[in-house]
């Protein structure tokens, strides 16, 4: 598959087909090609000998998609940066990535960034003045060059830039289109922010098949009336989201085939799909196919998939996450470094062309997590699991990295920032489960000296500081204050004891 050429052919075959819709804004395939070509031409003329990644700032604006393609046509990887990411984190991404340019389809509220900022008005001028000009196709990202870089949580307090190459993305997109039986011209739900790699599961399968991306933003999600009004207008056929989002939608009785009569495929990734959620979806959308998938950001969105049927639900108390895509393979590694036999639990290791080339500017972290096996890149996921008859079962994290509401995070990073807050002497993050999956984060805090009369005021002050350093989804929901943190005999935090205390 020639990814960019496949997207561009729709500008010729169906130029007026809508490529992306967000609220009242939309772009056609013709506009997508013209504006991304114009942008790529401008980037190449401004930075002829430079291939540093480019930050793309915004939320769900159509310009985000134009900017992504403009970057890669000019030979630059893009870094999606959502509006919700705190200024301090944006600053660290800019410094780590070596980016020299930031493209924005909205107002940039972050100050003192070490990059050149191209505003929304600047972009409009570029689209106009460079209209009709085409970039040199030889300059476009290709092969093992980075296509995008997504920053994930890092245990040192610094985000890690996962480098996904053109070949990685082609491997994923080709597999998704074929294995999920995606058809030409379908409407795809775009629910995940672009800085979250779940969004890749809808963006590129939609664009290469001439589909329409129907974006819903965080403000819509916070107002169910607006959300369901948008869904009723959408005629979505391919649903891509975390299971948690679908579970929330299922609380609305009208969320069914009557609301979305042409629903064909549900694609889930990012967290465990509970059996009860899958059963309700089968009841409400009897004609739709439900796919459960698995994969870390470091392996390009997902590498396994399974069609969830009533028979599968009856057979397994906890759903398997699927069979591996044909060009990759899974190894289950025991602690001694040997391969575990069928049915035995160990660390999931992914091998093949979906695997990232590593973390940008972090050779030590890359060496720790990535390796070569039989001449192919391999990623040690840190996830526990086992394989039976080719079917992968996921058993949670081996370390303190978790997925909460679809977002992957390292508890050590949150603890790092929490301990740096005023009024905090010590802290441990305890993830609290509800059934099979994590429900929220609890911060167990040893407070420092303070003058607050009430605990809730202390909590508000700590949360205010955390909001300056971490995304909202990494802020603990509840706080508990103790005089000390329990320790094990070998001097480590006794997390098991803490968990038993807080859940007693």
UniProtKB/Swiss-Prot annotation:
Highest taxon, organism lineage: Bacteria
Catalytic activity: holo-[D-alanyl-carrier protein] + D-alanine + ATP = D-alanyl-[D-alanyl-carrier protein] + AMP + diphosphate
Residue positions binding ATP: 152-153, 292-297, 383, 394-397, 492
UniProt subcellular location: Cytoplasm
Major subcellular site: cytoplasm
Binding locations of D-alanine: 197, 301, 492
Keyword Nucleotide-binding attached: yes
GO annotation (BP), single: lipoteichoic acid biosynthetic process
Pfam families: AMP-binding, AMP-binding_C
Keywords tagged on the record: ATP-binding, Cytoplasm, Ligase, Nucleotide-binding
Gene Ontology cellular component annotations, sorted alphabetically: cytoplasm
Listed EC numbers: 6.2.1.54
Similarity annotation: Belongs to the ATP-dependent AMP-binding enzyme family. DltA subfamily.
Task performed by this protein: Catalyzes the first step in the D-alanylation of lipoteichoic acid (LTA), the activation of D-alanine and its transfer onto the D-alanyl carrier protein (Dcp) DltC. In an ATP-dependent two-step reaction, forms a high energy D-alanyl-AMP intermediate, followed by transfer of the D-alanyl residue as a thiol ester to the phosphopantheinyl prosthetic group of the Dcp. D-alanylation of LTA plays an important role in modulating the properties of the cell wall in Gram-positive bacteria, influencing the net charge of the cell wall.
Protein name: D-alanine--D-alanyl carrier protein ligase
């Amino acid at each position: 598959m020639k990814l960019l050429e496949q997207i561009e052919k729709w500008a010729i075959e169906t130029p007026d087909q809508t490529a992306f819709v967000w609220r009242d804004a939309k772009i056609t395939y013709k506009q997508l090609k013209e504006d991304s070509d114009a942008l790529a031409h401008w980037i190449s003329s401004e930075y002829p000998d430079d291939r540093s990644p480019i930050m793309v700032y915004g939320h769900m604006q159509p310009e985000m998609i134009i900017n992504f393609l403009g970057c890669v046509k000019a030979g630059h990887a893009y870094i999606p940066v959502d509006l919700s990411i705190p200024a301090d984190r944006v600053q660290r991404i800019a410094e780590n990535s070596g980016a020299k340019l930031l493209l924005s389809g909205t107002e940039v509220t972050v100050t003192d960034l070490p990059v050149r900022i191209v505003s929304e008005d600047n972009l409009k001028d570029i689209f106009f003045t460079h209209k009709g000009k085409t970039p040199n196709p030889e300059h476009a990202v290709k092969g093992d060059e980075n296509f995008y870089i997504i920053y994930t949580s890092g245990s040192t307090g610094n985000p890690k830039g996962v480098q996904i190459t053109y070949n990685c993305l082609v491997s994923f997109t080709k597999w998704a289109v074929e294995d999920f039986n995606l058809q030409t011209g379908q409407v795809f739900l775009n629910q995940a922010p672009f800085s979250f790699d779940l969004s890749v599961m809808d963006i590129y399968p939609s664009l290469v098949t001439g589909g329409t991306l129907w974006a819903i933003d965080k403000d819509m999600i916070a107002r169910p009336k607006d959300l369901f009004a948008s869904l009723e207008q959408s005629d979505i056929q391919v649903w891509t989201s975390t299971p948690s989002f679908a579970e929330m939608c299922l609380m609305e009785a009208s969320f069914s085939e009557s609301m979305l009569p042409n629903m064909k495929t549900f694609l889930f990734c990012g967290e465990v799909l509970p059996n009860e959620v899958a059963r309700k979806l089968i009841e409400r959308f009897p004609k739709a196919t439900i796919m459960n998938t698995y994969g870390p950001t470091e392996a390009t969105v997902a590498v396994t998939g399974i069609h969830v049927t009533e028979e599968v639900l009856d057979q397994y108390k906890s759903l398997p996450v699927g069979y591996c895509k044909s060009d990759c393979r899974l190894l289950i590694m025991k602690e001694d470094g040997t391969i575990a036999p069928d049915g035995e639990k160990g660390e999931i290791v992914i091998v093949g062309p979906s695997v990232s080339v590593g973390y940008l500017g972090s050779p030590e972290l890359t060496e720790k997590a990535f390796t070569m096996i039989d001449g192919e890149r391999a990623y040690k996921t840190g996830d526990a699991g086992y394989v039976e008859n080719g079917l992968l079962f996921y058993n949670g994290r081996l370390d303190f990295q978790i997925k909460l509401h679809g977002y992957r995070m390292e508890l050590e990073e949150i603890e790092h920032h929490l301990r740096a807050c005023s009024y905090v002497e010590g802290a441990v993050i305890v993830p609290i489960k509800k059934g099979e999956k994590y429900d929220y984060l609890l911060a167990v805090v040893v407070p420092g000296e303070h003058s607050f009369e009430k605990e809730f005021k202390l909590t508000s002050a700590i949360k205010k500081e955390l909001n300056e350093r971490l995304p909202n989804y990494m802020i603990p929901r509840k706080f508990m204050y103790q005089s000390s943190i329990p320790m094990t005999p070998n001097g480590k935090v006794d997390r098991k004891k803490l968990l038993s205390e807080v859940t007693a």
